[in-house]
């Protein structure tokens, strides 16, 4: 029998419908894989009993011919999504053993469509990080290794658990969130596909907030088709989220294999960085040639305010985080450390509950919002954000269908290798991705090649607002040209 954990989500869906195997068998195969891969630390909570119950229910629905689009498909859920009655911590000590009394809109839509919950996935604490090293549960280990090396590598962040679990065959797909690259960067580091949809495409209700004007949920999966299938279930209007946009959800899967003939693909000159590795530059040009061979037209474009995006992002995001994280005080839920009075209790709780990177960003955010610095920093960053958005609008107004860039400035690096003395070194990982969040646009990362040490590298496609379909069509061209990337199993 085929190893059920090696199937794509689309193959598993078809196998379930054709009765080649049952949802319970598919779920059990993934639960066994999770148990054998605990060294990767991808899951922070496993839910085997719940998973089997959901799989049995899916089998019953399939038998009656009433299975939903994801009936029996085992998924992992980033620990930022509220799951009713199931521990949700954002991988922070401050939330302790919090069990939400409600379900996030995105996960409730996945369960509505018949998906199975395997467990909660590791992430950077409150989604603040680019390497999944800030989690209170410890770092996630990338299933990929450098050729001939046993050095443990990061999977990227903040959705490192999601990307590692998908790459290692520990789920058929995973939910993730992206505030400045947290879907696309880990996807690139693990040879998986990750799409950050247009801001407002997926509901943020029930997702622990980092920076509310930047956060967006999306899927990580093994193929472009799988990510399209998942986004179809995750997307949709939600009146409970004031930033949710009321637009019909297209059939994203139908975009796979769609013609890209005549599409204009922008190559932004500002993304050619000084000191960019030759491998990344070569891969970028190779991706452009693949799209050209499929009938697309390449045009050089200019996004002049790109160089200001990273500093502006690291003002806007911490400012919003400092406001959002003020709700964690130990009074109604989560960890509480008592003090002589309520102010001391707040101080003790936050000192013990928040990790170092979260504290750093709260401090930065509070500083840039303070009376003396608001105009100099926060207001100026918002003006830069408007200019970045305008750059993209002008580009798309010239008939450009999508923009092709590298996804990351390097392949995965070693755990503990970056950001120790200088946090900016870590922040630079987001250099190709933050502009997309600042402008509220959709972006997809697709694996496109390997570096000299055999590690996967990804390319990013940036699209017009609510035109994820074009990204899926173009992403499919890259995937068909580059092939799929699967790590050699060393952990079991």
Curated annotation (Swiss-Prot):
Q: Which GO terms describe its molecular function?
A: ATP binding; glutaminyl-tRNA synthase (glutamine-hydrolyzing) activity
Alphabetized Gene3D superfamilies for the sequence: Amidase signature (AS) domain
Q: List the disulfide bonds.
A: none
Q: Assembly state and interactors?
A: Heterotrimer of A, B and C subunits.
Keywords of this protein's UniProt record, alphabetized?
Answer: ATP-binding, Ligase, Nucleotide-binding, Protein biosynthesis
Q: Which EC class, in a word? A: ligase
| Protein name, per record | Glutamyl-tRNA(Gln) amidotransferase subunit A
PROSITE patterns, per the entry: AMIDASES
Pfam families found in the cross-reference section: Amidase
Origin species, per record, is Rhodopseudomonas palustris (strain HaA2)
């Amino acid at each position: 029998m085929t190893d059920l954990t090696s199937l794509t989500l689309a193959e598993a869906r078809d196998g379930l419908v054709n009765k080649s195997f049952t949802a319970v068998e598919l779920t059990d195969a993934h639960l066994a894989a999770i148990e054998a891969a605990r060294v990767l630390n991808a899951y922070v909570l496993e839910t085997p009993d719940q998973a089997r119950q959901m799989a049995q229910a899916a089998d019953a629905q399939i038998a009656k011919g009433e299975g939903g689009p994801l009936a029996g498909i085992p998924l992992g859920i980033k620990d930022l999504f509220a799951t009713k009655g199931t521990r949700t911590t954002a991988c922070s000590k401050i939330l302790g053993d919090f069990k939400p009394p409600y379900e996030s809109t995105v996960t409730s839509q996945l369960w509505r469509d018949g998906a199975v919950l395997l467990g909660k996935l590791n992430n950077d604490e409150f989604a603040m990080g680019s390497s999944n090293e800030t989690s209170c549960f410890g770092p996630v280990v990338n299933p990929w290794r450098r050729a001939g090396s046993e050095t443990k590598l990061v999977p990227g962040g903040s959705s490192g658990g999601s990307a590692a679990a998908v790459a290692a065959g520990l789920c058929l797909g995973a939910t993730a969130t992206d505030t400045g690259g947290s879907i696309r960067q880990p996807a690139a580091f693990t040879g998986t596909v990750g799409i950050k949809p247009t801001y407002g495409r997926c509901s943020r209700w029930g997702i622990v907030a980092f920076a509310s004007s930047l956060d967006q949920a999306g899927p990580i999966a093994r193929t472009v088709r799988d990510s399209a299938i998942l986004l179809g279930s995750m997307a949709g209007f939600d009146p409970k989220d004031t930033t949710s946009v009321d637009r019909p959800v297209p059939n994203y899967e139908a975009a796979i294999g769609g013609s890209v003939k005549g599409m204009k693909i922008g190559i932004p000159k500002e993304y050619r960085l000084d000191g960019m590795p030759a491998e990344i530059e070569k891969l970028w040009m190779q991706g452009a040639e693949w799209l050209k061979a499929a009938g697309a037209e390449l045009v050089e474009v200019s996004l002049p305010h790109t160089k200001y995006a990273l500093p502006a992002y690291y003002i806007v995001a911490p400012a919003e985080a400092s406001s959002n994280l003020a709700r964690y005080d130990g009074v109604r839920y989560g960890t509480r450390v008592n003090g002589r009075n309520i102010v001391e209790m707040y101080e003790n709780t936050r000192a013990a509950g928040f990790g170092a990177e979260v504290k750093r960003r709260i401090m930065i955010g509070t500083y840039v919002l303070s009376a003396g610095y608001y105009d100099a920093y926060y207001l100026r960053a918002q003006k830069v954000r408007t200019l970045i958005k305008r750059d993209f609008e002008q580009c798309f107004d010239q008939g450009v269908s999508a923009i092709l860039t590298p996804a990351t400035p390097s392949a995965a690096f070693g755990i503990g290798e970056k950001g120790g003395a200088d946090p900016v070194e870590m922040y630079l990982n987001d250099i190709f991705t933050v502009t997309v969040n600042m402008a509220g646009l959709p972006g997809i990362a697709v694996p496109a090649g390997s570096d000299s040490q055999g590690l996967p590298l990804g390319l990013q496609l940036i699209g017009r607002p609510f035109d994820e379909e074009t990204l899926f069509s173009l992403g499919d061209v890259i995937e068909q040209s580059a092939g799929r990337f699967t790590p050699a199993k060393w952990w079991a």
